[in-house]
Amino acid sequence: MKRKVSIMIICQRLARILVILFCAAVALGAEDLTLEGQWVLVPQAGTEIDLYGALTVEIARNDGGLTLIRTFGGGRGFKDALTLKTGGVANLVPVLDRVFPTNVFMGLSMPVGSERTIKAFWDDPASPLRLDETCDVLGSQGKAPLRSQHVFRAGPSPDLMTYTITRSTRETPISYVLKRKGSREACFMALDDQWTIGEGLEKQAFLISLQGLANRDAAKLYFVYPKSWDFNYTPPVLDYYRDKKYYTFRRLSTPEQALQTFKESVRGYVVWDRNVRTSLIVAFTIAGLEQAVVVDESLIPMMAANGLVEKEDLRGKLTGWSDARIYQWAYDRYGDRCSRDFIIWLGGEHGRIMKPGVADWGMMNHAFFSDLSTKPADKEEYDLADRILDRMNPLSMVMGWHSYKKDQERDHVRLVSSHGLRVEGLHTLPNLSFSHHVAATPGFVYRNHHNIGPGKTAVPQDKVYISCIQTDGMGLGAWHEPGRGEIPYAWEVIMNYSWLAPAMMEYFYSTATPNDYFVGALGGPGYVYPKAVPKNKLPGLIAKAREMMDLLDLRVFEIMDYSEGATTEGNTELTEEVAGAFYSGMPGAIGFINGYAPSFTFAVRDKRPLISYDYYLSPSRTEEEAVADLHELAAVNARRPYFLLVHVREYSNVKRVKSIIDKLGPGFELAPLDVFVKMAGEAPTFQERFLKKR
């Protein structure tokens, strides 16, 4: 099947690429790469240094030359201090110590009393520094000549440098990565699984508020969340930041130690009332504005011991008030100072439990916090939520999650979408204030694992073709669970990570296997119900989503719209008008996905299909029952090819899905999603169906 791509689309894409490259070049140049300064070894990123395990390098320019000091190890160390003329002058350096510092576990030594001849070449501080060195070295058989070339190169970031040593006697070069002294240094702390008022939430809330202050200007404090946490990636991402982003982490063990470490970032404290749960949510708003931490009365002595001043005491002030009254009071008092680009719904669990994982990000951005009901029947809270959202800037982010006690996900996303805004969940989203400051590698390009090239065809046979998409794939999903990479599998991409947490997005792309295929989600540039969006605002949301699709090399886009109820008590179908907006707004997409549970919208335009899910794999469904379900769907949909799209809930892993697929028999074939979509566009056997509005 040939896919027609207009010259206009090609030109637009080329223009975007050129703009991205130009901006990257300007940004890189503006960051002033230079070798001068003090550098420390990133030991996990290069060749091991025998015995010493550490290396510091100091580089400075002086009249007609340079000073270079290499220090191997610490107290039991070796220092090589050189003052050299540049421009190819032969500098003679006497050998005063027999230590061969890069490889002390090899039987080599320097002949004391001899000389090293070093020629230095260095045009300017940003250019590589090259040293050509000749000397003798002693082995067990006597002297041998040795030629070495040392190259110090700044980049790819201003705080990184590579140092390579090529020797005439060694086949492979020695390579080190160093970072500027004091850069990429952070602390981490393992959080306890305590989220109940009176049983540990007080400490957790304090620490998360401290994180929001500590990370305001740089990535300084990272938390490893317990295994039960919604987002299960905090341990491997910590390893990634250490091993690939070259962070050095110091472990913190107690709240007192954490406060001592980051006290300079704290201007005071806000006291919340343990008898009024909502007061903690309000306290996060105030604390973000006042650069304060949130504490209950048990932590006040620690504040006093550290000389911190009280900014607000909510004890007794909100007793007996409804949530609507509390949030109206808070908004009247603080709303004008809060961000119009970010707002936090600190919902989720209720009662005496709260899991405020995203609070650090909200505080960092001076966001207003609430858990207002978005259910129309709760008129007072709903009306206040509606008024607050109406004051937000276009395309602003509504982060966190709805209250499980007050309303439903569909209520929350519908109201947000009706204002042309976008949701990014959840309330448990961890470490965003840290990850936001960790940049992707300069020049990193997002590459999806496409299985079929632009303009290529895929002709189906008389089979049942199955393709699987994992919900919340890179966040709550099975990314770190067994089986990933064993079968073709598609994953929803949290597209806003491209700017909210760019290194996180790089992490997922760089750890993807050839069988992992990414799809854009969900309904817009974030979580959006397009049917609920005002008609004049939908094109702008789609255009923003398309920008991220292009950046992230995504060719399939997923829509989910529960604005008119679920599959059973309402509908999740799309109107022809809404589908048309995506077809026209995303001309580079090869196809679209619709639904969560099974949905019933199907279409093809220019061989680009819109396919709804035909099956939802419940985490509680046994493998045998799932196989029976899929066989029955194939019997009902008897024409071949039959395109059976499966949505996998985040609680299932790939190994389980593979086991189900393996039991289906020879009439079924698992297809990569892009191949599946291409085949469905080439030979659709589904009937066109749209939601008809009366």
What are these regions (language model features)?
Residues 62-74, 161-165, 263-278, 394-405, ...:
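Short, hydrophobic/proline-enriched secondary-structure or compact coil segments at domain edges
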Residues 181-334:
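Mature N-terminal, pre-catalytic/accessory segment of carbohydrate-active enzymes
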Residues 31-182:
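Hydrophobic small-molecule pocket/channel-lining residues, especially in calycin-type beta-barrels
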